[in-house]
Amino acid sequence: MPRLWYSRYLASARLRCRPLLISEQYGARIYQHLLRRTINTEANVQRPNDIVPLRKQLKEEAKRSKSQSRNGRGKKQVAANNEWELTVGIEIHAQLNSEAKLFSRAPTSTVAEPNSNVALFDLAFPGSQPEFQAATLLPALRAAIALNCEVQHTSRFDRKHYFYQDQPAGYQITQYYEPFARNGFIKLYDYDGIAPEDGKFVRIDIKQMQLEQDTAKSHEHPPSAHFLDFNRVSHPLIEIITMPQIHSPATAAACVRKIQAILQATSAVTTGMELGGLRADVNVSVRRRDAPPGAGEYYGVRGLGQRTEIKNLSSFKAVEDAIIAERDRQIRVLESGGTVEVETRGWSIGSTETRKLRSKEGEVDYRYMPDPDLHPLFIDDGLVSTLKENLPTLPDQLLAMLVGPMYGLSLEDAKPLVELDDGARLEYYQDVFDVLQALHSDDRDAAKKGLGRTAANWVLHELGALHTKAEVAWHADRIPAQTLAELIDQLIRKKITSSVAKQVLVMVFEGDQRPIQQLLEEENLLLRPLCREEYIALANSLIEENPQMVAQIREKNQLGKIGWFVGQMVRQGEKGRVEAQRAEEILRELILKRN
């Protein structure tokens, strides 16, 4: 986020923190040998050196899973029927869209050379102290406002103690006791993909949102080493904690998907699950519906079964599949007379079972304590009000606008426009629509009614298919919005046929720089419509050659076969002269007329 934008509000925010007591020299040569640490492991299994892309890994695991099911080796899923109630709570960790780290002046970057953006505090050097970077608060506040949270005037930072190689200080700075936002909620609708049993709408409450620092990134180097990249240490995160109010795996996945969409719409984050910028932990418990309330208590909700936590889920499908697997495991344990243990479990792509990682830690194990080096965080109401007034349009509002009278889209077309390419596809579509509106400004309102649907069809399906076929990422400059709008305009005005429009689209996509009008004239593609007599003559010749099909249409009412005749007229007629709609009108008149 540009620094000039947020500097206007820092004075009113009244954010206070203890300044650094030592000078931080980024990348000091005398410390470079400490920036990359090698962790030896006991693993003796040889693994391939090539890094397998995540998408390829997902495809391979899906194929293997299908093969196992066909051969009868797949997991027998335990039906989550009326006997059992599933309860799920979610904790989402999202990297904030910030140029600065949370507690040091080192810049954030996901693509920089390993260990090149590291401050002394990031490595926990003796004497270094945290210096809260006020700019990191702005994307967090936008997220909190968009998720309907109550922003707290005062919040504080705590230390969460644990030892692992990716956390050099031996503790993580978070906001366990007094987070900066509480009591939010998110609304999920049937079009978000919630489970059918949840109906058309479900509300999930958000207990709290808290700021915390990220850990180092571990790179595995087989057979027995891990390299640590400390660029990610102290990258600002928000942790979003939902209440345990979710009762189906599909709704849990929909919840994570919707939260990610909201965070991206508000520019609170730069990347989502697909690039590792968002991770989810799920807490899963089951209980018999006809049994007395369970002994489990979770964020004030009593009567639950014993929960387990599944860590670091990195895709929406992983969220759903991991919950299904853990639900079924717990049901099997309870039905066999066992007890569900309090533990943290893991999940691997393509797996059919969760696996135990460790016994789950609690508040006592983490030894939460206030951070003595950080003052309370004071957030001014004026800052919150300003951010709320300038909040971007959220996904639900965009959908309502697209299916409304202005654009008139179906929900099936509106959702991809909102979800694809981090909003770039929607922005491109709106540019195309605006140009079309200007080109048809003199038309009656009835004539303009279909412009939105026509533009969506070409942006989503025709142009989208070309990108998919070419295996290239979406790029608006490939065919400028003005160019596509002019092409669609020629089609709407019936100066070209649909097949010619698609042909021209391919030519422009492959690099033809000529203006649309010039291209159509030079390639002799403009429609020279047939007169009525020419349409009738062409149609009659086809009718005479295919009497059996004509009889089927007339006697058996197989009207779909008229489309075959239309296609033949377009192919047999002179290129660019047969208009499909006019051809169908003539065919219906000739075939269906009464003798």
From Swiss-Prot:
Record's subcellular location: Mitochondrion
Keywords: ATP-binding, Ligase, Mitochondrion, Nucleotide-binding, Protein biosynthesis, Transit peptide
Chain residue ranges for the region called Disordered: 59-78
Pfam family, one: GatB_Yqey
Recorded catalytic activity of this chain's protein: L-glutamyl-tRNA(Gln) + L-glutamine + ATP + H2O = L-glutaminyl-tRNA(Gln) + L-glutamate + ADP + phosphate + H(+)
Domain of life the protein comes from: Eukaryota
Coiled coil, from the record: none
GO molecular function, one term: ATP binding
GO cellular component: glutamyl-tRNA(Gln) amidotransferase complex; mitochondrion
Enzyme Commission no: 6.3.5.-
Residue range of the transit peptide in the UniProt record, numbered on this chain: 1-114
Primary location group: mitochondrion
Entry's Gene Ontology BP terms: glutaminyl-tRNAGln biosynthesis via transamidation; mitochondrial translation
Family: Belongs to the GatB/GatE family. GatB subfamily.
Record function comment: Allows the formation of correctly charged Gln-tRNA(Gln) through the transamidation of misacylated Glu-tRNA(Gln) in the mitochondria. The reaction takes place in the presence of glutamine and ATP through an activated gamma-phospho-Glu-tRNA(Gln).
Known partners and oligomeric status: Subunit of the heterotrimeric GatCAB amidotransferase (AdT) complex, composed of A, B and C subunits.
Matching NCBIfam families: gatB, PRK05477.1-2
Protein name: Glutamyl-tRNA(Gln) amidotransferase subunit B, mitochondrial
